[in-house]
Amino acid sequence: MADTLSRITKIVVDRLGVDEAEVKPEASFKDDLGADSLDVVELVMELEDEFDLEISDEEAEKIATVADVVEYIEGRQ
């Protein structure tokens, strides 16, 4: 999980301009990290590229926290 989390953290920091310390597993993209719906779409696209996978729109809607992303990605690798 550590490597996956660190890769996700880097993407979130770069995309949302938040401090790395704010990107915790329980952090909500919208409530804690200030992402709007466009930010979330762009994050999903970057995650797909980084981890070489496809996240369906239906699955993307279920992803609310950093931990959700880690769980989703690790479940598909």
Swiss-Prot record:
What compartments host this protein?
Answer: Cytoplasm
Q: Which GO terms describe its molecular function?
A: acyl binding; acyl carrier activity; phosphopantetheine binding
Gene Ontology CC terms = cytosol; membrane
Q: Name one GO biological process term.
A: lipid A biosynthetic process
Enumerate the UniProt keywords alphabetically.
Cytoplasm, Fatty acid biosynthesis, Fatty acid metabolism, Lipid biosynthesis, Lipid metabolism, Phosphopantetheine, Phosphoprotein
* Annotated ranges, domain Carrier: 2-77
Pathways per UniProt: Lipid metabolism; fatty acid biosynthesis
Which residues does the record list as O-(pantetheine 4'-phosphoryl)serine (modified residue)? S37
- Keyword Phosphoprotein included in the entry's annotation: yes
Q: Describe the processing and modification events after translation.
A: 4'-phosphopantetheine is transferred from CoA to a specific serine of apo-ACP by AcpS. This modification is essential for activity because fatty acids are bound in thioester linkage to the sulfhydryl of the prosthetic group.
- Which residue spans adopt a coiled-coil conformation according to this UniProt entry? none
List all membrane-crossing ranges. none
Query: What does the sequence similarity comment in the record state about its family?
Result: Belongs to the acyl carrier protein (ACP) family.
Q: What does this protein do?
A: Carrier of the growing fatty acid chain in fatty acid biosynthesis.
State what protein this is by name: Acyl carrier protein
Which organism is this entry from?
Answer: Halalkalibacterium halodurans (strain ATCC BAA-125 / DSM 18197 / FERM 7344 / JCM 9153 / C-125)
Q: Which gene encodes it?
A: acpP
